[in-house]
């Protein structure tokens, strides 16, 4: 896996990243750090990637289990250390899984498998942060 990150220049603290799969992402800093607040912060992108990783797992596991999943949202709420390097210390993942006749046990299994076995991003973050997760099922 490869990503190239480039600073956009001396007028701020924005960066563009090109992924190995050919996609572009822009990041920016807070105004108090010289940024213009025009894009997500790099640490927000860590949460974005982690949320995408675990939501992907949950949907895939449910689909493979032939569950009629129609939607999956995950809200990540995180706390960071007060001192540098300001790592994440707590992250809560709350899943809202939408579908028809979804089994509670199947959703719980999918969430647990993602966090315990498959989502490399959340497993890495668990080395420094207390990870908790919850879910709700919405019938459609």
Model-predicted segments: where are they?
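Extended beta-strand/beta-hairpin segments
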Residues: 1-48, 59-140
């Amino acid at each position: 896996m490869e990503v190239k990150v480039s600073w956009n220049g001396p007028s701020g603290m924005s960066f563009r990243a090109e992924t190995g799969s050919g996609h572009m992402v822009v990041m920016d800093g807070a105004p108090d750090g010289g940024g213009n607040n025009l894009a997500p912060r790099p640490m927000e992108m860590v949460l974005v990637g982690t949320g995408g990783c675990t939501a992907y797992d949950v949907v895939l596991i449910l689909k493979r289990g032939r569950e009629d999943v129609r939607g999956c949202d995950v809200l990540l709420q995180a706390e960071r250390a007060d001192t540098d390097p300001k790592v994440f210390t707590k992250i809560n993942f709350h899943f809202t899984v939408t579908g028809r006749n979804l089994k509670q046990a199947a959703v719980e299994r999918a969430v647990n498998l993602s966090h315990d076995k498959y989502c490399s991003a959340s497993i890495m973050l668990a080395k420094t942060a207390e990870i908790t997760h919850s879910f709700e099922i919405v019938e459609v």
